[in-house]
């Protein structure tokens, strides 16, 4: 639980708290509960939305809202209800599916569902990639632009090198998974346009690892020793595993913060 509390982003903790205090009893009725992070359509950072599926007692929930004098606002034909007092909202798409999050996140989700904004289902390549990650506890898919932004942060000063410019323009997509069933296991794959580019990216990444080892703490050096960087058939791969306690200690390190900032 301590590790979970430290790994979850503040927005997701807020969403989890709002759900628990909403009186909706989603944890009892939901068969599937998932959280998704996505880029805000307006370009203002990242939004997180929750999606739950199950046999919900919608009549009882609506009666609860009526008792609490909670009034919805209409977004097209969708009734969006405030959820608690911390700015969260919830909407029932049908008898078995609900979407919840902050007001802007719920609106963005409904706009995508109603065909008013681009949505994930229109990207056939990412839908295909999803099959390799969606069974994990935490997973992410990034398109070419998102991959470029992510790797620029990971590379740090090395992103200024000429070789990186060549690599950056040949990034197609990336994905990562995290598994907490036996310690912490992190696997990332970055798909490049060709085998040579993937090998070049792996070489650059290994160079970054060596530089950070030279200036890192013993904990950071140990983490980098446990990280395997390679390339295979046009894909850059990065794999890391550790115990829960090792990973928890790493979360506050300058190395980890420089990667996730």
Report each predicted region and the residues it spans.
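Solvent-exposed, non-transmembrane alpha-helical starts
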Residues: 60-62, 109-111, 198-201
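Structural boundary/hinge residues at secondary-structure and domain interfaces
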Residues: 1-82, 128-166, 203-228, 235-237, ...
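Short, solvent-exposed coil/turn segments at beta-strand boundaries
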Residues: 45-47, 56, 75-77, 91-98, ...
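A conserved glycine-rich beta-strand in the N-terminal activation segment of trypsin-fold
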Residues: 88-151
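A short, solvent-exposed beta-edge/loop patch
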Residues: 83-115, 183, 228-247
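One face of beta-strands
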Residues: 48-52, 98, 172-176, 182-190, ...
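Gly/Pro-enriched, hydrophobic low-complexity segments
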Residues: 116, 170-172, 176-221
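Short, surface-exposed beta-strand/loop micro-motifs that present aromatic residues
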Residues: 33-39, 86-93, 174-178
């Amino acid at each position: 639980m301590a590790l979970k509390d430290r790994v979850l982003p503040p927005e997701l903790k807020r969403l989890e708290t709002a759900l628990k205090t909403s009186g909706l009893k989603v944890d009892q009725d939901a068969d599937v509960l998932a959280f998704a992070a996505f880029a805000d359509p307006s370009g203002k950072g990242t939004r997180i939305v929750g999606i739950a599926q199950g046999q919900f007692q919608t009549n009882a929930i609506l009666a609860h809202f009526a008792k609490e004098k909670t009034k919805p606002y209409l977004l097209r034909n969708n009734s969006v209800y405030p959820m608690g007092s911390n700015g969260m909202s919830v909407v029932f798409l049908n008898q078995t599916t609900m979407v919840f999050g902050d007001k802007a996140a719920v609106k963005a989700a409904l706009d995508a569902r109603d065909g008013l904004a681009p949505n994930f289902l229109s990207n056939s390549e990412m839908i295909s990639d999803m099959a390799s990650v969606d069974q994990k506890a935490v997973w992410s898919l990034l398109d070419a632009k998102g991959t470029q932004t992510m790797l620029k942060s990971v590379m740090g000063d090395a992103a200024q090198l000429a070789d990186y410019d060549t690599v950056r323009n040949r990034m197609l997509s990336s994905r990562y998974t995290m598994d907490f069933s036996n310690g912490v296991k992190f696997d990332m794959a970055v798909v490049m346009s060709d085998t040579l580019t993937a090998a070049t990216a792996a070489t650059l990444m290994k160079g970054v690892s060596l530089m950070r080892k030279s200036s890192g703490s013993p904990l950071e050096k140990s983490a980098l020793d446990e990280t395997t960087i390679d390339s295979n058939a046009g894909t850059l791969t990065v794999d890391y595993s550790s115990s829960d306690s090792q990973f928890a200690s790493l979360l506050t390190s300058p190395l980890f913060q420089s990667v996730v900032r």
